[in-house]
């Protein structure tokens, strides 16, 4: 967990970076941007709460690959509302996947968006921030954010582009036929048209915690359109609410396939399979028609699913 490595098609390690020597521990994601820098989701090994308790999954570092040095670092506790925490009763269903004081954010995805940083925190939302650490916007239920964050919280729109005014939909206490927030989400993707594709795990949707086998739960692949000027978010398309067999409380991923404009929906754990056991799915969908082009059951849990070309670009 302390190293990030670059590996070639033959499985040979081309180069690696020792994060422990820099004071960090790797988790979830590392990407190389067009600027040639390495952006890594990390835990800072000496980061603590005011109580002295360790905190995890709430830092990002940028590394110069050739020098192996940190060019910039961000502490998400200085960007997001680290006080937005609700203690989870350990006796509640699904509590093992829930928020803890030390794991208040559970940052699980990071990538460049131009010169900005685009990220996901499982318990806080999908968000974009600038290099100076200033927030641009947040896609998240509005409940429990401190007032100083209100200007960053995107306002939901219905399918016709009208602002949703129902306070319970805005807070996340109920869903609308036209809109729902992402819950416990993973792997947000920037689409070529500037929209965002997200795996909405549906964990504790509307703040209701359940055992993962309990009926009525679902995960979705969802496409959002963000208007940065007017600070709004519109749900363009989604799939999964009709597939309770694809509910995944954690892990999982989505992918946009530019060659066909199809998408991959990859719920990675706890799915009820046709043989009565549990595992995951890989499903390719045409969003224009909602046609399932390909579907496969995986008889074990998995972190993410990604379609790769047979050979790297340029070969």
Q: What does each model-identified segment do?
A:
Residues 1-315:
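Histidine-/acidic-rich catalytic cores in large beta-rich domains
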